[in-house]
A protein has these predicted regions:
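Conserved, well-structured functional cores that handle cations and Mg-NTP chemistry
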Residues: 1-152
């Protein structure tokens, strides 16, 4: 099976899970997720180099496509550009994980994490744990000094 065929299969899987996203948003998610899985890195430079080789496309073209996927609509080139509302992906991602969950027990391990980024931000993340890997399914970024149950 060719790499294009595998990416097409993956695109079908991703578009089924995230049916509310536009085709360009789906394709960006396909490229990012496949690139991370294949390269073992979340760095845009490594991913764009690998995908450019695999897809026989220019590295700068792939880099720009990956970069514009996460930019705000007003920062993207071209017309009809949209923002990606990440929060709308949390419920579909959790549904997808639960659908693929293979366990004889009807338990799903969850982890709540509060990570501080210096004195500026606290990132709250709710994740599902699968095979020693935490998959974030919900999150919020807050000012670091804001009181809350994670920081009394």
């Amino acid at each position: 099976m060719s790499c294009q065929e595998r990416l097409s299969q993956w695109e079908t899987e991703v578009s089924t899970a995230f049916a509310h996203l536009s085709h360009p948003q789906i394709w960006g998610l396909v490229l990012w997720s496949a690139g991370i899985a294949l390269s073992g890195s979340a760095g845009i430079t490594q991913i764009s180099a690998l995908l450019a080789f695999v897809l026989c496309q220019g590295e700068q073209t792939v880099f720009q496509r990956l970069r514009e996927w996460y930019l705000d609509a007003d920062q993207k080139s071209g017309k009809k550009r949209r923002d990606l509302e990440v929060s709308t992906c949390f419920a579909p991602l959790l549904r997808w994980v639960v659908r693929l969950w293979q366990s004889d027990k009807r338990q799903l391990p969850l982890v709540l994490d509060a990570t501080s980024l210096g004195n500026r931000w606290t990132i709250l993340a709710l994740s599902v744990v699968i095979r020693s890997c935490a998959i974030p399914v919900a999150g919020k970024v807050l000012p670091a000094q804001q009181p809350g149950s994670w920081r009394p």
